[in-house]
């Protein structure tokens, strides 16, 4: 017959290719697919590959004007999920040509843009991505990375300490700056704007930036250490965001901050480029991540958002605390913590890593442990996260019965005690509480903190 064969045809005829050998330049995705009852897994997997690449619901004559074989996504492997009924991991390979260079935005629009509302699927979750070297190389990545940050701050051989200034909303700029000064003076390396502190009626951004810079320089002069405050540059428009970053640079401060999910990847990459060009470190907060990553069977795993951030650019990113949670969660969290810091990460399903990822010397990102932690957690945090991390104690500093500066002292003493004990070969996991107790004998600030938050 003349012409093409019109009509709706099964996706799996075109997009399910179990014999396909993946290319080094392909972007690989692992999806957790929950098909609707009656939809075979091959069809569901193929549908995901089709809808997130070249497919549409019916055959169109313009298909003849291009080479589908060159541009289509392919579902190349499907495996059932152990212990789950009717859940499958579908592996999809995308040819590199489908993506714009250096654009996380375009990568996500393609891979997760449309397909999550697909009728044949009950639920869909993107578990992991393998970014090929050829694509990684089109990104600048983190503005500076772990080593450059240590050199800028002159801080080595230990995790860095931070604190989010609370109450997060309602303080005037001057009182806010005062809290910043007290924490830094007490011994923290960083203080932090809360993620929702942008520029509100009770405290406009410019006033906050000025008072925080003043606090920072005063604390720096008195302690002889380099200090930082994450000035949140997140704003309603990219122009306004850059304006704030420029002002931060003019004040000479070391670091600014961005909410990368609410701000969006385009804004984040823009800011990351500015930060590298102007010597600013960039702290990233993950506000809104749970909207995307909390459901076990739908959405995107945080390790994908973390990989995307390393491409887009950031020097620190919040990544959970691990402490006091389930053992399994610890392995998974350490999996994406390594994906943030290391140059090369092996596939390891027990840690949730579906693909071997080579970052081809893209700088690393410091993971930030933040939320509900206090001095008794210090040994565990030091052991789990190691030196290349930022430990943030908000309430764990400001909640100290004697005030902010003693709270900061308590945290710094606890950290130094843990690092020293570890370097002497002691086991932080089993002797942690004892190490803290010994240290509190000669630090009244730490002793008071130990009283407030029981082990």
Curated annotation (Swiss-Prot):
It catalyses: 2 (2R)-3-phosphoglycerate + 2 H(+) = D-ribulose 1,5-bisphosphate + CO2 + H2O; D-ribulose 1,5-bisphosphate + O2 = 2-phosphoglycolate + (2R)-3-phosphoglycerate + 2 H(+). GO terms for cellular component: chloroplast. It comes from Lupinus albifrons. The keyword Chloroplast applies. Heterohexadecamer of 8 large chains and 8 small chains; disulfide-linked. The disulfide link is formed within the large subunit homodimers. Belongs to the RuBisCO large chain family. Type I subfamily. It is an enzyme of class 4 (lyase). Its EC number is 4.1.1.39. It is found in: Plastid, Chloroplast. RuBisCO catalyzes two reactions: the carboxylation of D-ribulose 1,5-bisphosphate, the primary event in carbon dioxide fixation, as well as the oxidative fragmentation of the pentose substrate in the photorespiration process. Both reactions occur simultaneously and in competition at the same active site. The gene is rbcL. This is Ribulose bisphosphate carboxylase large chain. Its cofactor is Mg(2+). GO terms for molecular function: magnesium ion binding; monooxygenase activity; ribulose-bisphosphate carboxylase activity. It comes from the Eukaryota. Gene3D superfamilies: Ribulose bisphosphate carboxylase, large subunit, C-terminal domain, RuBisCO large subunit, N-terminal domain. HAMAP family: RuBisCO_L_type1. Substrate binds at residues 114, 164, 168, 286, 318, 370. Mg(2+) binds at residues 192, 194-195. GO terms for biological process: photorespiration; reductive pentose-phosphate cycle. Binds 1 Mg(2+) ion per subunit. The active site is at residues 166, 285. Keywords: Calvin cycle, Carbon dioxide fixation, Chloroplast, Disulfide bond, Lyase, Magnesium, Metal-binding, Methylation, Monooxygenase, Oxidoreductase, Photorespiration, Photosynthesis, Plastid. The modification N6-carboxylysine is found at residue 192. The disulfide bond which can form in the large chain dimeric partners within the hexadecamer appears to be associated with oxidative stress and protein turnover.
